[in-house]
Amino acid sequence: MKPLLTPLACALAALCITGCAHGPAAAPATTDLALPTAWAERPGDATPDWAGLLDPQLAALQARALAANRDIALAAQRWKQAQLLVEQSALRWSPSAGVSANASRPVQTQSSTRNVDIGGVTVPVTTATGWSRSYGASVGVSYELDLWDRLAQGTAAQRAQAEAARTDIAAARLSIRSQVAEAYWTLAALQAQRPLAEAQITLTRETLELTRQRVREGKLLPIELDKIAVNLQAAESRLADLSADAQLQRHILALLLDEPLPGPQPDATLPAAAPPRWRLAAPADVLAQRPDVQRARLGVDAALAKLRVSEAERYPRLSFSAGLSTGGTTASDWLAQPLASFAANLVVPMIDWQRLDLQREGARTELDTTALTLRDTLQKALADIESQRIEAERAAQQWQANAGRLREATENERLAQLRYEVGAVARADWLQTRSALLDAQQAEIRLRLTQWLRQSSLFKSLGGA
């Protein structure tokens, strides 16, 4: 008796079981990087809460920008395209089927013969008339076993690339929110400084006239006029800068909101208090939230999956196909003449080793490159966060130092006004102290703006809060 299974059939059965046992493998974790366990700067006392820092008008502007911005829309389209590629790659896991049908109408082979007399010679002539019809149909199915996870790793690479495209959306949204907040707060600071700058110009002009009169009376040297004139020119230039900067910030908002120029003119308000000092989580947890770090990590996952695909290309492939076809000139022929087929196809790479070696080395080089990119991204991200915290601390110290100057200027202006009212000092002297107070008030607004801009930059560097 012949054995039921030949050695080749046993080998094919074993390969089938092996192929069914493997599924899509998730990209493994890369080598852990040495990250600090704590931040260099002293921790804050407030839980990061970006939404709690926004007034309703700013929150509404951010929502409009997120809905209308073109950069976010383009990133979303790229992510959608990447998802479609993942779905196409996943189809390789499913059997592929095909159906075909055909119909023909050749000239009828039935013929008639008659004799024709040509020059006394009888020649038989055959003629064919009429048409015949025949029909056929076939159906087939094929399936490739993923013996070495080649298809699974190819899908994993596509999935990692799609997730990397998704991080672009998060990065764009984060950037837009930060830019809208910065433009809004800058516009608010400019609007708050404008009445102070106008009042300072009025005071300086009056001081200039009083000084000119005292110079004519011989009470002051002419050089004092030049000093006041320089102060007036600086005050007028500052007011012009405020107007120009306000227009530029409106243009920025127009671009972010996808609106026509000159852009919106909101009644912006700069927060009266300094921003809170945030208490950050562990560096590893914070870095994991950044879109650029996520993209770099996904790049490593995709490169690792591609390397595994290149390794699997070196091993045999096994696929199966089955088909059923039939046809004929009549309906009875369809049932009487079916043809079924089954085939197993084993492809073994034997003479293409040089190309496969180069392909594997290219994939390994790509993996090394993405690993270095991940390390570089982590180091730069860590330095960026620490730098933003240092800048925020510097802005806070500058604001505190100016608070002392503002208190001194306020007290000096109060005393000068009292002395002027009792005739102890001239009006020009009192106006100068009042101008110094306006300088300190404008500096306080600028330093408070700097603090909030640093807070926005810190929010962006943290990957959202």
What are these model-predicted stretches?
Residues 216-244:
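Repeat-solenoid scaffold signature
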Residues 56, 76, 93-171, 277-285, ...:
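Small/polar-residue-enriched beta-strand and adjacent coil segments characteristic
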